[in-house]
Amino acid sequence: MSRFEDIFNGLKRAHGCTYINDTPKNGEKLKGKSFIKREPVTSQLYENHLNGIEATLGIIPITDDNTCIWGCIDIDSYDGFDHQKLLAKINLLKLPLVVCRSKSGGAHIFLFSKIFIQAKLMRDKLIEIRAILGFGNDEIFPKQIELKSEEDTGNFLNLPYFQGNKTTRY
């Protein structure tokens, strides 16, 4: 559990929650309610996420000192996204990325760092990678390069592996 927390470390004072309403039909986006909770991120939240206890956990990658240890390109695709083709391209280019299926059926392309780096550096690198992979318009997390105040939370990304072994996000 602690390894999962370390890998998906982020803002400690707030997190995202998503409640899924129903099972989508082919080619449709999962419908649900997402919001930010301004309360501490705990080990129990990570455990609940992996055990499939709703709501899904969303982590805000940018921290209070405007650094992050991971970032993500969020490819929204609701029907027939070819994960194998994406993985083949990443492998061919020898990019240090991890791909997980997102709840929409698209992909979350993660870039991890061994140490916390400036959010701007992470965003800049992901923008470059996004262009190389041909996904120039897809979202990047962290979305911000700095939090403007103690009240600012940034944007969250739903983590992979909701429901652990039964997940569709792998």
Regions picked out by a protein language model, each given a short descriptive name:
Residues 1-70, 80-88, 155-156, 161-166:
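DNA replication initiation on ssDNA origins
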Residues 99-108:
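Short, conserved phosphate-binding/catalytic loop or strand-edge motifs used
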Residues 56-83, 92, 113-170:
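DNA replication initiation modules
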Residues 14, 107-112:
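Broad hydrophobic/π-residue packing in well-ordered secondary structure
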Residues 95, 105, 155:
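Residue-level signal for beta-strand positions within conserved beta-sheet cores that form or flank
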Residues 89-100:
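Active-site palm subdomain of RNA-directed nucleic acid polymerases
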